[in-house]
Amino acid sequence: MKIILFLALITLATCELYHYQECVRGTTVLLKEPCSSGTYEGNSPFHPLADNKFALTCFSTQFAFACPDGVKHVYQLRARSVSPKLFIRQEEVQELYSPIFLIVAAIVFITLCFTLKRKTE
């Protein structure tokens, strides 16, 4: 029982918390620092901002902050190459040659042909 408690204590002491963020490739991501005096561990440059926030360019990358209390916050950014459909404005294109238009045009043409033929007779 003491061994299990000891292993649980070691596990809690070396705790890692994972944070996942999805973003559009090349945009700037605004994240909150987990602790004010943490140590940054990563190869992507980040820009510290006010209120314990930082900005990072979105690429598929992983970095971490090691807090003084021993907790390590691991961030995983997953970059998408296309923007979400929410921001894409799609306009409906009305084609001139839709089936309904062709049917109506054919009926009008046939009617005109018969009426002009009767007037000439």
UniProtKB/Swiss-Prot annotation:
Residues 16-81 form the X4e domain. There is a cross-link at residue 119 (Glycyl lysine isopeptide (Lys-Gly) (interchain with G-Cter in ubiquitin)). Its main location: host cell. The chain crosses the membrane at residues 96-116. It is found in: Host cytoplasm, Host perinuclear region; Virion; Host endoplasmic reticulum membrane; Host endoplasmic reticulum-Golgi intermediate compartment membrane. Residues 83-95 are annotated as: Disordered. Residues 16-80 are annotated as: Ig-like fold. Residues 1-15 form the signal peptide. One of its GO terms (biological process) is symbiont-mediated-mediated suppression of host tetherin activity. One of its GO terms (cellular component) is host cell endoplasmic reticulum-Golgi intermediate compartment membrane. Changing residue 85 to A: No effect on ubiquitination. It holds the Pfam family bCoV_NS7A. Poly-ubiquitinated by host with K63-linked polyubiquitin chains. Changing residue 2 to A: No effect on ubiquitination. Variant B.1.1.7 is also called Variant Of Concern (VOC) 202012/01, Variant Under Investigation (VUI) 202012/01, or 20B/501Y.V1. Interacts with host BST2. Interacts with the spike glycoprotein. Interacts with M protein. Interacts with E protein. Interacts with the ORF3a protein. The di-lysine motif confers endoplasmic reticulum localization for type I membrane proteins. This is ORF7a protein. It comes from Severe acute respiratory syndrome coronavirus 2 (2019-nCoV).
